[in-house]
Amino acid sequence: MNATKFVVLLVIGILCAIVTARQVEEVSKETKLGTSLPKSTNKGIGAQLSAAGLTYSGSSVSSSASAFNNPKGPGASASESGYTSTIGQVIAKGRKARVSSASASAATGEAAAAVTRKAAAARAKGKVASASRVKGSSEKKKKDHKGKKD
């Protein structure tokens, strides 16, 4: 999208917001941002604030090793697998809602095989780590009416 199209769409969006916004005696933060609220909800707007967070972290590892010396001679095999998963969800409502969620996962694997009689060897390793973090906050700040005349 070039700059001209962006500016045109921005102007159209602002004009639509101005045309559709209703006048409210006490202007709330939400109204200043472009949404319109009925006059009856201005005093209890703090109850509508909320914050939500979701985090997921998953890990998987698989290791396999194999060594054979045939016909019908020595053979070796080794296998390793692992999986970890963490999921967190936090939803908070209220005046000072805070959200914090953390998640971490780790999986390690190691496999080894060895054969004698003319030698055969195999080795496999695997390591996985995963992390996730979510933060959030919601608070309606009090208006400062100092020095203002009604």
Swiss-Prot record:
Belongs to the UPF0540 family. This is UPF0540 protein At1g62060. Residues 1-21 form the signal peptide. Keywords: Signal. The keyword Signal applies. One of its GO terms (biological process) is seed coat development. Residues 57-82, 119-150 are annotated as: Disordered. One of its GO terms (cellular component) is apoplast. It comes from the Eukaryota. Residues 57-67, 119-135 have a biased composition (Low complexity).
